[in-house]
């Protein structure tokens, strides 16, 4: 996700800057913020779609492209990432965005439930079987509302009960950056970090954190700056003294402990038990 997201955002900006574009958004697995994404899905609304697809095909990041059409265009970036651009008239943008945001499982369940209610859902609109009429919506909120659901955030659309929750008003609120109360993995100058305990704690406090775990590398991770067991005992005492000074944040004594080839950890059990937080990590030998 961290590699493909900048590509998607750059192309979305390019679409939005074109005079023929009314709206453009990232869709697909990128919009759902899945850990891995195989390609980029972009959707846009335009009354002159051919001008828009022809322009995006010539973007500086694009190495190859299919034939631009009024429906969209397929692209490949210089780094080999596939891009699928879909275009619809502005009145159908909500339908297109909902459909191509996925997931496939979420959409399949949504369609199945809609059919049971006499409706057919696609990127082209919602067709009422009784009247034969197809309704178009400019926003996803309207799409879900027409089907009897609260709006479902893209990150929740994985067919894990979100439709039932959206129907009965019990969808969870997504975690946001302001909800993060602390950091549980950071290094200091004791191993390969660049800040002291005091500097790291001050930075964490400035972010509004309530706690910070110091988890320097352990004794045998193989990258230098090893921390011996004796030195880690001293570090525990240093952190206790720091907390006693009332620094406005709680610092936890921890370690990123190497998993040894035979499966054990490279600190004795009594030392591990004295820590507030232990991260077990594979570094070499596997």
Where are the model-predicted features located?
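Non-cysteine beta-strand/loop elements that form the S-adenosyl-L-methionine
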Residues: 86, 210-215, 275-282
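Active-site nucleotide-donor binding segment shared across nucleotidyl transfer reactions
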Residues: 9-51
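Active-site gating/metal-coordination segments in enzymes
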Residues: 263-284
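Helix-hairpin-helix
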Residues: 1, 26, 114
């Amino acid at each position: 996700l961290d590699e493909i997201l900048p590509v998607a955002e750059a192309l979305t900006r390019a679409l939005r800057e074109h005079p023929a574009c009314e709206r453009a958004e990232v869709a697909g697995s990128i919009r759902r913020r899945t850990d891995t994404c195989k390609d980029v899905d972009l959707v846009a609304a335009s009354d002159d779609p051919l001008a828009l697809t022809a322009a995006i095909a010539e973007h500086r990041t694009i190495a190859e492209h299919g034939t631009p059409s009024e429906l969209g265009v397929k692209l490949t970036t210089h780094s080999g990432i596939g891009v699928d651009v879909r275009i619809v008239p502005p009145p159908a943008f909500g339908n297109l965005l909902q459909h191509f945001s996925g997931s496939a499982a979420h959409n399949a369940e949504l369609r199945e439930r809609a059919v049971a209610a006499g409706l057919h859902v696609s990127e082209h609109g919602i067709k009422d079987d009784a009247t034969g009429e197809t309704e178009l919506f400019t926003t996803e909120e309207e799409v879900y509302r027409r089907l009897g659901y609260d709006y479902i955030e893209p990150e929740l659309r994985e067919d894990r009960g979100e439709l039932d929750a959206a129907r009965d008003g019990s969808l969870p609120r997504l975690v946001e950056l302001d909800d993060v109360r602390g950091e549980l993995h950071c290094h200091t100058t004791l191993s390969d970090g660049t800040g002291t305990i005091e500097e790291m704690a001050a930075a964490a406090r400035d972010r509004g954190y309530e706690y910070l775990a110091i988890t320097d590398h352990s004794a045998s991770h193989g990258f230098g700056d090893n921390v011996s067991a004796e030195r880690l005992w001293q570090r525990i005492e240093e952190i206790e003294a720091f907390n006693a000074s009332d620094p406005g944040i709680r610092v936890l004594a921890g370690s990123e402990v190497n998993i040894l080839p035979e499966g054990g950890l490279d600190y004795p059990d009594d030392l591990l038990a004295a820590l507030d937080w232990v991260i077990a990590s594979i570094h070499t030998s596997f």
